[in-house]
């Protein structure tokens, strides 16, 4: 048998998306005692035993970036130099100037400061040329992605067969039906039944079979 994790009792607080990369060795030594409780029940239990965090408001930010300025955090805690660059369209035409690629993500519309007469969105980020590609909303949708750095949980390996799963491409994504198949030793192709918005390179894609985590990888 294999160790696996399943979704929590409260979908809004489910953390399986962030835990897909746990190994079998780690899972064998892991207990998750609050997975069957709602957040309200945990607060009630905390209050009963006098924990001061019982009424602490939920955090809406990255827990280790208190001012939510993640771009500044990256610059201060890495060797990355964040330079200004160009907004371009898919043909390479320059549309304006951006303040550094760490300030943007695929699918973003707000904060671009581009007056083009119609709504535009980030469709791609090109770190090798320091360009942020801008396009229409439909350009953000795709019915296919590939991923690498795979970790399998409920199964030992995908092998040569295809598998029907539900895939989440971000924490807040509700999941979408798709077919996955291996296209290399450490690569998987994921083909969705319906196009999905803003599958972003560097983010995790996590595969589910019902409530159980099958595995996942890093979107290319």
Model-derived regions, located:
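Nucleotide-activated chemistry modules centered on ATP-dependent adenylation/adenylyltransferase
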Residues: 1-213, 218-220
């Amino acid at each position: 048998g294999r160790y696996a994790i399943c979704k929590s009792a409260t979908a809004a607080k489910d953390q399986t998306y962030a835990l897909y990369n746990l190994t079998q060795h780690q899972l064998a030594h892991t207990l998750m005692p609050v997975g069957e409780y709602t957040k309200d029940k945990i607060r009630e239990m905390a209050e009963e035993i006098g924990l001061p965090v019982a009424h602490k408001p939920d955090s809406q930010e990255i827990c280790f970036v208190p001012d939510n300025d993640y771009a500044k955090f990256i610059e201060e805690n890495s060797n990355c130099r964040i330079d200004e660059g160009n907004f371009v369209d898919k043909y390479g035409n320059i549309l304006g100037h951006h303040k550094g690629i760490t300030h943007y993500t695929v699918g973003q519309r707000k904060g671009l400061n581009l007056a083009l007469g119609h709504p535009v969105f980030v469709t791609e980020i090109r770190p090798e040329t320091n360009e942020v590609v801008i396009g229409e909303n439909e350009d953000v949708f795709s019915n296919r992605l590939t991923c690498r750095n795979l970790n399998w949980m409920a199964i030992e390996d995908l092998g040569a067969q295809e598998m029907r799963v539900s895939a989440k491409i971000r924490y807040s994504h509700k999941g979408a039906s798709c077919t996955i198949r291996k296209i290399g030793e450490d690569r998987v192709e994921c083909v969705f039944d319906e196009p999905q918005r803003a599958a972003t390179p560097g983010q995790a894609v996590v595969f589910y079979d019902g409530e159980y985590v099958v595995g996942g990888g890093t979107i290319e």
